[in-house]
Amino acid sequence: MKILFVLISILYAVYCFSSEEDVDSAYLANELEPVEDINSEQYAALEPKEEQGRSCADMGQDCKDDCDCCLNIATCNCWFGRYFCSCTFGDYQTCLRKKGKCKRNRPQSCPRSNLNRKKG
C-alpha cells in the first residue's frame, strides 16, 4: 500500500511539473491570449505610487549606526569592525542608549521584560 502511494505521488509530481512547463513555454511564446480585466476602467485612475525611502531600516537591512534601525531595541551590529552592518535585536540597555544619543528614530519608551519583576 505504501509503495502504491509513493508511486502515485511521483506520477502526480511529474505531471504537475510537465504541465507547468507547457504553460510557461506557451506564455513565453505569446501563444496564450492576455486575460482582459472587466474592471480595468475602475482602476485606471489609480496610478502606482513610488515607494518612498524610509527614514529607518528594518531588521536585517543595512545600517550605519543604532539610530538607523527602526525598532526601539534594535541595534546596528557590524562584522569585522565597521563592515557588513545590519540591524539586529538588542535589549533594554540598547533602547536607553538610543534614547540618549539619537535625534531621529528616537524611542518614545523602552520596553522592560517582565521576567525579573517580583510579584506580590
Swiss-Prot record:
Organism of this sequence: Lycosa singoriensis (Wolf spider)
Stretches assigned to the Agouti domain: 56-95
Domain notes: The presence of a 'disulfide through disulfide kOR' structurally defines this protein as a knottin.
Protein family (similarity comment): Belongs to the neurotoxin 05 (agouti) family.
UniProt KW keywords: Disulfide bond, Knottin, Secreted, Signal, Toxin
GO cellular component, one term: extracellular region
Localization annotation: Secreted
Expression (tissue specificity): Expressed by the venom gland.
This protein's name: U13-lycotoxin-Ls1a
Propeptide residue range(s): 17-54
